[in-house]
């Protein structure tokens, strides 16, 4: 079953061009690899969480999330941000903009962590 709603959460606008930190900042992933921070990845992730919560963001809400995240990243005054810190920043932005999506975002993160722990228990 395909609906228009499934495609509504995807948007062509690149917020990474409009909202940038004031310097190059890298996100340090769980495996230790580093990726240049781009707020467009945040918008993609929160869009998926909104979809799971059966809602979507307005353009203004997306811009508010971007501005919040970039402001917080700039405030840290570091060149590298561990992914758990980035998740917390994004979650805080969502709490301000659309709390139901913050819950979806948090629940999905917890689900992934629980799944990894379960696999670790089975494998070791």
How should these model regions be labeled?
Residues 1-124:
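Extended catalytic cores of very large enzyme megasubunits
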């Amino acid at each position: 079953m395909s609906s228009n709603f499934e495609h509504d959460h995807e948007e062509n606008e690149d917020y990474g061009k409009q909202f940038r930190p004031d310097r190059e900042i890298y996100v340090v992933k769980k495996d230790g690899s580093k990726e240049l921070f781009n707020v467009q990845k945040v918008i993609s992730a929160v869009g998926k969480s909104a979809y799971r919560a059966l809602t979507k963001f307005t353009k203004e809400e997306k811009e508010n999330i971007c501005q919040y995240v970039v402001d917080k990243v700039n405030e840290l005054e570091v060149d590298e941000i561990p992914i758990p810190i980035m998740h917390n920043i994004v979650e805080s932005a969502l709490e301000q903009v659309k709390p139901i999506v913050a819950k979806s975002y948090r629940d999905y993160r917890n689900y992934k962590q629980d799944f990894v722990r379960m696999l670790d228990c089975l494998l070791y």
